[in-house]
Amino acid sequence: MADALILARALADPTSLALDTDWAGLVTMARAEQLLGTLAWRLHGLPLPEDVALLLSDARAAAENGRRTALWEAEMARRALAPLGVPVVLLKGTAFVAAGLAAGQGRSIGDLDILVPREALDAVEAALIAAGWEWVKPDPYDDAYYRRWMHELPPLIHAERDRMIDVHHTILPLTARVRPDAAVLIADAVQLGNGLSVLSPAAMIVHAAAHLLADGDLAGGLRNLWDIHCLYGEAAEDDPAFGLTLVEEAGRHGLHDAVVRALRLSQQLFGTQVRAYESSGRIRLTPRWSDRLFRRRLLARDDWGRATRPVTRLAFYVRSHWLRMPPAMLARHLWIKWRRSKA
């Protein structure tokens, strides 16, 4: 059975694709992994079957529309929060396109994600609600859980534009075993000149690796790993010693192992040119046996776009909850959620 390795190879080396490629399978995989716009950008200008070329042209147009929408939402948030005088850091896809980074080319962008100081959360929430955003989660338990334990406010959606915003005060749940220093992330952010900022190049990768390996179950992880590939390649091109800057930043936030594993996986799947520092132990790229399990999870997609390898996916789902909270809290949380679902 096919897996998403064909998609990873197509992204890494578009010229390797033959005209008789299983285009239907490749496109279906890319759509399921939210990488269709990215694939369309990577294949632009190459000889393609006519129907594939038309489909990918539409995908590029859709990605461009998504880019404009994301930037407009960022501007709306900026206007709502400007009177507060608090730093507002764009995260994820919106940050990539706002900063003009390669990782933003064709990228699928969903919610607007921002990072603000924790002490400003109440004021930020009030300002957004006054500007037309409203709560998505009316359930009192979910609302209380977010506010006490999560790294973000309960999600908000704009009443007229139907666009969501996630307001973060750090990058991992407060229950996680790792506690990144959000104050450092905000202090080191790069100003865009319009009242908004983005994380530093190293912090962007740290955040992406945290989201990929220290928080979630790797669902949609191929897109996150492609982000890391692009971000690293662009930063290392400007600074050959960027790898050392990156691992220093990762260590500051307790995410050294996650970042190094992400670099290994990116190298293995996309051929990312990462300079190793084996002797110092700072960047060891020698494959680990467990890397195979992560690759197996990342590539768990068939040419019909269906998720495959259910046992592997379940194992990583359990792992994600184990990383997010202590066992006793996890058991209590799952029990409450199960009981409420039966009510």
What spans do the regions from the language model cover?
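Conserved NTP-donor binding/palm subdomain of two-metal-ion nucleotidyltransferases/polymerases, i.e.
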Residues: 1-110, 116-343
